[in-house]
UniProtKB/Swiss-Prot annotation:
One of its GO terms (biological process) is aerobic electron transport chain. GO terms for molecular function: 4 iron, 4 sulfur cluster binding; electron transfer activity; metal ion binding. The gene is hip. Specific class of high-redox-potential 4Fe-4S ferredoxins. Functions in anaerobic electron transport in most purple and in some other photosynthetic bacteria and in at least one genus (Paracoccus) of halophilic, denitrifying bacteria. Competent in photosynthetic electron transfer to oxidized cytochrome bc1 complex via the membrane-bound c-type tetraheme. Homodimer. Monomer at different ionic strengths. The lineage of its organism: Bacteria, Pseudomonadati, Pseudomonadota, Betaproteobacteria, Burkholderiales. [4Fe-4S] cluster binds at C38, C41, C54, C68. This is High-potential iron-sulfur protein.
Length: 75
């Protein structure tokens, strides 16, 4: 499996990525809600796995309970 994205990665920081959706910056991202997570995002490729690929972080994986500002509701 690919390595996990670190919250300290430059790309992760620019997107406000957190490994735990409950820790998202509510000041910077007021539209964030706790039911938003990588696992409910259209970009998440991990299906039901605890972690999976995301096209925004090439060569790395995100955790299912994570979140970033690019979150888009699964269709």
């Amino acid at each position: 499996a690919a390595p996990l994205v670190a919250e300290t990665d430059a790309n992760a920081k620019s997107l406000g990525y957190v490994a735990d959706t409950t820790k998202a910056d509510k000041t910077k991202y007021p539209k964030h809600t706790k039911d938003q997570s990588c696992s409910t995002c259209a970009l998440y490729q991990g299906k039901t796995a605890p972690q999976g690929a995301c096209p925004l972080f090439a060569g790395k994986e995100v955790v299912a309970k994570g979140w970033c500002s690019a979150w888009a509701k699964k269709a």
